[in-house]
C-alpha cells in the first residue's frame, strides 16, 4: 500500500515558526508564564499606575476593555478590576513606546503602541500592544510612565540627566542641559517683569511643538514673539519628565527632613541641607545650583512679577523634589517640607552653592590611575571620551572595559620603550578629553588581544574583590592560584614570538633570539622579573597550551563577572523589597493614626451629643414637674366650687 502526499504541502519551517509565534501572541497570562519567568505579579510591589484602557486584539483587530496595572518592570492586564490572575503581561525594559497619529475621521481615539525589544520578540514571539486611552491627557500620562519604566531613549525629554549632559559635551562644555540654558536665558531676558511667571500655563500646542523639536535633535531658537509662559512651561515639563528627579529618590527623605528642621532650628537645617547637597551626583548638583540662582534672579523683581521666593518654591519645588511613589497622600504630606527647603535653597544659594564648585573637575592624570594602563601613541585602539563623573556602577563597568584599552602587544608603554619614554611627548588631559573616537592603526591579531585583555582583567578582578560589599566565591580563589602560571605562559609566549604591528612582514633568520633578549632586558628593567634564557625556544605544543590557558582564564574572569553581577542584582532586589516593606509599614502606621484621629473625633462628638441629651432630659423633667403642679392646681380649683355648692 502506498501513501500519497498532497501536492500543495509546504515544508518550509518559516511558516510553522510564524504560526507558533502567532499562537504565542494570544496566550493567556498563565501560559505566558512559561516563556517569561517574572510574569506573576508580586503583591508586595506597589503599582506605579493602573487604569482602564482598550486593547486591540492581534487577529480580529477589535477593541477590548481591560484593566491595566503597571508594576515594577511588567505591564499586566486583567479582565476586571477585582481579578487577581492576569490575562497577560509584557516585559517593558528595552521596549519602544510611541504615539500613533489617527485620521481626522477617527477623532476621539487616543492610540499608542508598545513595541517589544527585538531580542524579546524573537524569543517569545510576542506582537506589539496597541492600546487606546479615553483622553489625550490619560494617554500622555501612560506614555510617560511606560517610557520611564522601559528606559528607552526618547530624545531630550525623558532622558536621564547624566546621559544628556554627557551627550551635549560634544557641543562644548555645559554644566547643565542646553534646553535649560536656552529657557533660562530667554526668561531672564523677556520674563522678569511678566506677572505670574511659572504660575500661569503656556500654550499646550506650542509646548508640544517645542518638545518634539528638541526630541528630534533640533535646537530651536526662541524669537521675540515666543510666549514667555510657554517657555516656562517647557522648562517645567523637562524637569517633570526626567526619569529620576534632580533630587534622587534615595535622598528624598533627607531633603524632607531638612524642611522639617527649618521650623525648629534653621541653622541645623542648613547644615543638614549642605550634607545632602554634598552627596548629590555632580550633574544633579550643577543643575540644582543653576536653577536656584536663576530663580533668585527672577524673585528680585517680585514687586512686578508677583512671584516671591515662597511662590517660586511652591511652583518649582515639586518638579525638582518628588517621591518615587506618585501617591496623592504622599505628595500632599511632603509638599510643605519641599516648599520650605526650596525656599532655603533659593534664598541662601550663595552659601549652599558657592561658585567655586561650578568649575568642572579635570580628569585625573593617567600615571595616577592604577586601574587603567596608558595607551601609547603608537598603539592600536580608539581614543575614547572620558566621563567627568565616575559613579560606583560606572567604575565597575570601566573595569570590564579596561582590558580593551591596554597595549595590543600585551605590554605597558613603559615596557615597550623604557629608554625613550622620557623623550616621547605626552598629551595633556585636556587634549584627549574632548576628542571623538578615532581609529589610529590597524587591529591587532587575536593572540595580542587576549594577552592584553587578560592583564586588564586580572587587575580589574583584584579591584572588584577589594570591595567589602561583594563576597568572593571559590572561583575567585582559583583565579588567584593561576596567576603565576599565567605569567610564566606570557614569558614563554614573549620569548617565542614578539608580535609586531606589521605581522605580514617576514622576520630575519636571526631576529627571534635578539628580540627575545631585548624583551627580557626591558621586562627586567621595568618590573624586576627574571626571565628564562633567550636561547631557549618553545615548541608549537607549548604555544597552544598557553593560548588554551589564556582562554580558560578569560572564561573564568567572565564567569566571575557574571556571578558578581547576579549577586549585585540579588542584593538590589532585596534592598528594594525591604524599602517597599518599610514603605508599606509606614503607610499602615499613617493610616492607623488617621483612623485613630477619626475615632477620637467621633468619641468627642458622641460625648457632646450625650451631654446635650442629658441636658434636654433634665429640661423635660423640669417641664413635667411644672405640668404636674399645674394639673394639681387645676384639679383643686375644680373641686373647690363643688364643695361650696
UniProtKB/Swiss-Prot annotation:
Gene: ARHGAP25
Cited PROSITE patterns: PH_DOMAIN, RHOGAP
GO cellular component: phagocytic cup
Listed name of the protein: Rho GTPase-activating protein 25
Organism from which the protein derives: Homo sapiens
GO molecular function: GTPase activator activity
Compositionally biased region (Basic and acidic residues): 420-431
CDD domains named in the record: PH_RhoGap25-like, RhoGAP_ARHGAP22_24_25
Taxonomic lineage: Eukaryota, Metazoa, Chordata, Craniata, Vertebrata
UniProt feature, compositional bias: Low complexity: 393-409
One record GO biological process: negative regulation of small GTPase mediated signal transduction
Coiled coil residues, start to end: 541-644
PH domain ranges (all copies): 46-151
One Pfam family of this chain: RhoGAP
Modified residues (Phosphothreonine): 406
Domain Rho-GAP: 159-353
Modified residues (Phosphoserine): 362, 395, 536
Annotated site (Arginine finger): 199
UniProtKB keywords: Coiled coil, GTPase activation, Phosphoprotein
Role: GTPase activator for the Rho-type GTPases by converting them to an inactive GDP-bound state.
Compositionally biased tracts (Polar residues): 487-504
Residue span of region Disordered: 355-444, 469-550
Amino acid at each position: 500500500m502506498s501513501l500519497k502526499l498532497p501536492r500543495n504541502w509546504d515544508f518550509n519551517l518559516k511558516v510553522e515558526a510564524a504560526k507558533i509565534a502567532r499562537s504565542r501572541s494570544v496566550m493567556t497570562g498563565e501560559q505566558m508564564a512559561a516563556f517569561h519567568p517574572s510574569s506573576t505579579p508580586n503583591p508586595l510591589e506597589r503599582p506605579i499606575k493602573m487604569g482602564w484602557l482598550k486593547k486591540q486584539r492581534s487577529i480580529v483587530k477589535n477593541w477590548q476593555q481591560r484593566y491595566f496595572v503597571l508594576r515594577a518592570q511588567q505591564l499586566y492586564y486583567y479582565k476586571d478590576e477585582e481579578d487577581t490572575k492576569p490575562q497577560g503581561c509584557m516585559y517593558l525594559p528595552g521596549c519602544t513606546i510611541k504615539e500613533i497619529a489617527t485620521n481626522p475621521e477617527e477623532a476621539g481615539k487616543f492610540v499608542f503602541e508598545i513595541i517589544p525589544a527585538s531580542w524579546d520578540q524573537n524569543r517569545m514571539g510576542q506582537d506589539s500592544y496597541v492600546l487606546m486611552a479615553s483622553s489625550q491627557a490619560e494617554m500622555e500620562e501612560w506614555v510617560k510612565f511606560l517610557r520611564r519604566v522601559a528606559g528607552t531613549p526618547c530624545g531630550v525629554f525623558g532622558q536621564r540627566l547624566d546621559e544628556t549632559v554627557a551627550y551635549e559635551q560634544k557641543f562644548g562644555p555645559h554644566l547643565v542641559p542646553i534646553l535649560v540654558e536656552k529657557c533660562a536665558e530667554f526668561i531672564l531676558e523677556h520674563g522678569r517683569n511678566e506677572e505670574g511667571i511659572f504660575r500661569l500655563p503656556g500654550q499646550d500646542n506650542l509646548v508640544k511643538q517645542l518638545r518634539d523639536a528638541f526630541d528630534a535633535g533640533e535646537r530651536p531658537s526662541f524669537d521675540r514673539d515666543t510666549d514667555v509662559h510657554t517657555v516656562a512651561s517647557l522648562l517645567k515639563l523637562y524637569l517633570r519628565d526626567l526619569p529620576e528627579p534632580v533630587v534622587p529618590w534615595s535622598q528624598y527623605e533627607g531633603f524632607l527632613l531638612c524642611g522639617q528642621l527649618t521650623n525648629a532650628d534653621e541653622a541645623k537645617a542648613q547644615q543638614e541641607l549642605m550634607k545632602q547637597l554634598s552627596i548629590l551626583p555632580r550633574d544633579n548638583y550643577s543643575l540644582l545650583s543653576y536653577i536656584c540662582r536663576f530663580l533668585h534672579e527672577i524673585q528680585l523683581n517680585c514687586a512686578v512679577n508677583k512671584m516671591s521666593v515662597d511662590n517660586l518654591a511652591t511652583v518649582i519645588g515639586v518638579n525638582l523634589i518628588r517621591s518615587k511613589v506618585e501617591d496623592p497622600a504622599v505628595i500632599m504630606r511632603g509638599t510643605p517640607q519641599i516648599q520650605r527647603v526650596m525656599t532655603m535653597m533659593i534664598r541662601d544659594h550663595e552659601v549652599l552653592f558657592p561658585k567655586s564648585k561650578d568649575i568642572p573637575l579635570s580628569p585625573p592624570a593617567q600615571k595616577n590611575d592604577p586601574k587603567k594602563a596608558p595607551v601609547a601613541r603608537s598603539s592600536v585602539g580608539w581614543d575614547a571620551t572620558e566621563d567627568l563623573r565616575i559613579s560606583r556602577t560606572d567604575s565597575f563597568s570601566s573595569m570590564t572595559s579596561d582590558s580593551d584599552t591596554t597595549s595590543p602587544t600585551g605590554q605597558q608603554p613603559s615596557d615597550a620603550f623604557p629608554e625613550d619614554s622620557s623623550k616621547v611627548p605626552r598629551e595633556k588631559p585636556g587634549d584627549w578629553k574632548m576628542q571623538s573616537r578615532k581609529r589610529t592603526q590597524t587591529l591587532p591579531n587575536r593572540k595580542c588581544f587576549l594577552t592584553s585583555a587578560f592583564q586588564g582583567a586580572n587587575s580589574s578582578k583584584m579591584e572588584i574583590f577589594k570591595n567589602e560589599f561583594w563576597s568572593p566565591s571559590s572561583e575567585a580563589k582559583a583565579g588567584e592560584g593561576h596567576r603565576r602560571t599565567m605569567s610564566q605562559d606570557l614569558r614563554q609566549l614573549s620569548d617565542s614570538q614578539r608580535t609586531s604591528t606589521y605581522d605580514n612582514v617576514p622576520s630575519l633568520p636571526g631576529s627571534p633570539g635578539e628580540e627575545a633578549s631585548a624583551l627580557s632586558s626591558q621586562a627586567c628593567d621595568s618590573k624586576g622579573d627574571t626571565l628564562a634564557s633567550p636561547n631557549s625556544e618553545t615548541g608549537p605544543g607549548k604555544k597552544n597550551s598557553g593560548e588554551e590557558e589564556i582562554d580558560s582564564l578569560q572564561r573564568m574572569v567572565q564567569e566571575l563577572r557574571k556571578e558578581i553581577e547576579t549577586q549585585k542584582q540579588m542584593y538590589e532586589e532585596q534592598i528594594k523589597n525591604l524599602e517597599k516593606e518599610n514603605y508599606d509599614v509606614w503607610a499602615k502606621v499613617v493610616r492607623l493614626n488617621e483612623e485613630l484621629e477619626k475615632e477620637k473625633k467621633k468619641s468627642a462628638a458622641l460625648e457632646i451629643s450625650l451631654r446635650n441629651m442629658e441636658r434636654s432630659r433634665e429640661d423635660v423633667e423640669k417641664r413635667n414637674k411644672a405640668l404636674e403642679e399645674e394639673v394639681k392646681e387645676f384639679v383643686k380649683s375644680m373641686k373647690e366650687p363643688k364643695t361650696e355648692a
